[in-house]
Design a protein with these regions (language model features):
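An alpha-helical, amphipathic repeat domain used for nucleic-acid recognition
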Residues: 1-154
């Protein structure tokens, strides 16, 4: 009976993973809400990780890459979102460092600035609004100032 209950939780987790990728913490939370004991959750997570169905490191790298390139988010927002998903800080930092080598963050910031300032004219108020917008998207003030400086040079 115990084995069958574990299989039930395992199959439940597999069905979740058919629809989208989850972190181990998210799966553990779903199992907890489903009534799984800590021991059963650990067993299911161990089996899923052993078969390669969940991998927080790979998930984090994909999430960071997509967040930079598709969502146009900065490091701070990405970090915050991954923490909400239960990803370990060390994995988050490694993922950000790895992806930053491949992605031109300044280019992303410049694209966002160009979308916000369409006519090319920039008052102090417009620049402040753009800075606030970019900071809300999770970009570093240093990166923002560098990108604004580059635009002014053009």
């Amino acid at each position: 009976v115990k084995e069958r209950k574990n299989d039930e939780y395992f199959h439940y987790a597999l069905n979740l993973l058919k629809k989208r990728v989850y972190t181990s913490w998210e799966i553990a939370e779903k199992l907890r809400r489903r009534g799984a004991s800590d021991e059963k959750k650990e067993d299911v997570l161990r089996r899923l990780e052993g078969k390669g169905f969940i991998d927080d490191r790979k998930y984090s790298e994909m999430y960071v890459y997509d967040s930079f390139t598709l969502k146009k988010w900065g490091k701070w927002k990405i970090r915050q979102q991954l923490r909400k998903k239960g990803v370990n800080d060390e994995i988050i930092e490694e993922s950000i460092a790895k992806v930053i080598e491949e992605v031109d963050v300044k280019k992303i910031i410049v694209e966002l600035i160009n979308k916000r300032i369409k006519n090319g004219k920039t008052s102090k108020q417009e620049i402040q609004n753009v800075k606030r917008f970019l900071m809300n998207r999770g970009f570093d003030i240093g990166e923002i100032d560098d990108a604004i400086g580059k635009l002014r040079e053009m």
